[in-house]
Amino acid sequence: MAFIKRSDKKKKPFKKESSLFKRKRYCRFTVAGVEQIDYKDLDTLKDFIGDNGKITPARLTGTKAHYQRQLNTAIKRARFLALLPYTDLHKH
């Protein structure tokens, strides 16, 4: 069985997202001058947790790597102490 290569199909070039609507990301913790992210600051931690309870990656939030590691540790500590839920998928 032979495979026929179709050259009549035109491949569309890959388009990048328009930079017109893209907002520049910045690290909130660097701007605020935070030294250590506290696991008891639940309002801040909730901003970095998605709808399903997953930790939002740094490439989406713009957080620097140093603070992203602290953020991950703080969220995991808050979950362990039952200050934050592991997931929002629990049915009541």
From Swiss-Prot:
Keywords: Ribonucleoprotein, Ribosomal protein, RNA-binding, rRNA-binding. The lineage of its organism: Bacteria, Pseudomonadati, Pseudomonadota, Betaproteobacteria, Burkholderiales. GO terms for biological process: translation. Binds as a heterodimer with protein bS6 to the central domain of the 16S rRNA, where it helps stabilize the platform of the 30S subunit. Belongs to the bacterial ribosomal protein bS18 family. PANTHER family: 30S RIBOSOMAL PROTEIN S18, SMALL RIBOSOMAL SUBUNIT PROTEIN BS18M. The keyword Cytoplasm does not apply. One of its GO terms (cellular component) is cytosolic small ribosomal subunit. The keyword RNA-binding applies. This is Small ribosomal subunit protein bS18B. NCBIfam families: S18. GO terms for molecular function: small ribosomal subunit rRNA binding; structural constituent of ribosome. Part of the 30S ribosomal subunit. Forms a tight heterodimer with protein bS6. Pfam families: Ribosomal_S18.
